[in-house]
């Protein structure tokens, strides 16, 4: 599934509910899911980590839909297929 396909799926399924909730409350739900992801990671719950990542992505798509942001387009603009620092692919920058 492409990023736009996922964002459209979330729009089709939840846009009406998201609009009623509004961007501010939807953003709070997103943060709640980030917290759940953090807890699952810290506890070493590998299965839950993947599920929580999916939840985080879904809530991010909901926020993007409410704010009329095309995630796939923004990702391509922000992250071209090479490192922004060394211009190589894969990155050959010195370690962190």
Regions found by a protein language model. Name each.
Residues 1-53, 57-96:
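Flexible "arm" and connector segments at domain edges
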